[in-house]
């Protein structure tokens, strides 16, 4: 019997043992009897589904299996699948072009801001999405995003910061910066954390997974709003920053959001996920070069190619191609909804942080210098695509694939 299997058998017993004391002392919501009775429909690969209990979900995660919990979002992607054969492929700029505007902004990114926010975020006992701590951390994050926008004067220009509410209590957070069109560029990170051994009881500081991504895009937002053109809504495209709830439970928060967007026919032109942006030690220990891991499986190839150009132009370290499998982060929800999505991580996937999903996912293992490179990527990515003329790009692409007279 695997060790994880043996531990899994003990989980309901141990959870029940800690219910009273944990709830009274830490205010963590513990409902082991409810979790044991619930059944969830998960998707382990495209079209491969299975009904499981809550404990079985965590057993799969402990064994390295990723999945989407599609129980409440079984229709995600249906509308986009019906139009996929007739809709045009999305195209992206062939090169970066706004270096004169972007580089001055990059100079204002701050490691101090990253550290201050991450210290607060990891001070919560856990950010488990079904816990009171998870609710509290989400409320703090919502307030911090509002503070960031307010200090920049963003609310006077129509920028909004709103919770996207979920039935489990921990809400997602969406900051929206209106542009000249409703075409939307999204950057995301997940705000929740988990300890895969007794999620409702044990601590889960989640410094790297995904506290690092959460504060990375928050810092990118802070500096982006220093652009008068962006602040005043002069960008060609609308920009959204997303902090997803319940990624660890099977991409629950992001599925709910992109399901809503798909049904509303929202025009999302690009989505970039930042999940784990601060750990480099295993890369260095292996004698390899510090780099940004660019995921190349289950992503949009055109958007991913553009991201490589952004890294080359605006980051101080190179990129390395790597794979993470199906449903490995929230970009998978956007992709399933028919939106071009991409994912970057701190290193080659096999060199990524091995402290995650435990009480040992701590700040002391992270590099804020490396996190800053991800912030540079996020800021440059958003700025370049915010001002991209997608109408012009679409027309150019249509001309390039049009048949010549001799082919008719």
Curated annotation (Swiss-Prot):
Per the record, the gene is LAP1
Protein location:
Secreted
**Positions contributing to Zn(2+) 1 binding:** 190, 209, 275
Q: Name one GO cellular component term.
A: extracellular region
Q: Which GO terms describe its biological process?
A: proteolysis
Q: Which cofactor does it need?
A: Zn(2+)
MF term (GO), any: metalloexopeptidase activity
Q: Note the CDD domains from the entry.
A: M28_AAP
What are the coiled-coil residue ranges? none
- Upper lineage ranks? Eukaryota, Fungi, Dikarya, Ascomycota, Pezizomycotina
Name listed for the protein in its UniProt record = Leucine aminopeptidase 1
Q: Which organism is it from?
A: Grosmannia clavigera (strain kw1407 / UAMH 11150)
Top-level EC class = hydrolase
Cofactor binding mode, per the note? Binds 2 Zn(2+) ions per subunit.
């Amino acid at each position: 019997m695997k060790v994880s299997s043996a531990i899994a058998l003990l989980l309901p017993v141990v959870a029940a043992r800690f219910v009273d004391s944990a709830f009274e002392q830490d205010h963590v919501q513990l409902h082991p009897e409810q979790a044991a009775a619930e059944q969830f429909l998960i998707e382990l690969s495209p079209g491969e589904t299975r009904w499981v209990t809550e404990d079985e979900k965590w057993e799969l995660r402990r064994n390295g299996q990723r999945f989407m919990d599609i129980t409440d979002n079984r229709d995600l992607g249906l509308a986009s699948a019906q139009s996929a054969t007739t809709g045009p492929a999305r195209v992206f700029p062939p090169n970066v072009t706004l270096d004169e505007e972007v580089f001055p902004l990059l100079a204002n990114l701050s490691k101090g801001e990253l550290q201050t926010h991450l210290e607060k975020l990891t001070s919560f006992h856990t950010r488990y999405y079904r816990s009171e701590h998870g609710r509290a951390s989400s409320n703090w994050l919502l307030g911090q995003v509002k503070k960031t926008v307010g200090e920049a004067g963003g609310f006077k220009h129509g920028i909004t910061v709103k919770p996207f509410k979920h039935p489990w209590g921990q809400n997602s957070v969406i900051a929206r910066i209106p542009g000249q069109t409703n075409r939307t560029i999204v950057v995301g990170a997940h705000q929740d954390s988990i300890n895969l051994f007794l999620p409702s009881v044990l601590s889960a500081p989640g410094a790297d997974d995904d506290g690092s991504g959460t504060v990375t895009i928050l810092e990118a937002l802070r500096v982006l709003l220093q652009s008068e053109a962006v602040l005043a809504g002069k960008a060609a495209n609308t920009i959204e920053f997303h902090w997803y709830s319940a990624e660890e439970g099977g991409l629950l928060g992001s599925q709910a959001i992109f399901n809503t967007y798909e049904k509303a026919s929202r025009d999302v032109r690009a989505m970039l996920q930042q999940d784990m942006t601060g750990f480099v030690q295993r890369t260095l220990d292996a004698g390899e070069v510090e780099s940004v891991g660019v995921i190349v499986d289950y992503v949009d190839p055109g958007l991913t190619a553009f991201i490589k150009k952004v890294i080359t132009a605006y980051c101080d370290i190179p990129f390395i191609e790597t794979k993470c499998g199906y449903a490995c982060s929230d970009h998978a929800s956007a992709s399933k909804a028919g939106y071009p999505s991409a994912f970057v991580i701190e290193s080659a996937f096999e060199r990524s942080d091995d402290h995650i999903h435990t009480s040992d996912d701590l700040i002391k293992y992270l590099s804020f210098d490396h996190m800053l490179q991800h912030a540079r990527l996020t800021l440059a990515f958003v700025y370049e695509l915010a001002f991209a003329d997608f109408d012009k790009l679409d027309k150019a692409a249509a001309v390039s694939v049009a048949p010549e007279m001799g082919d008719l």
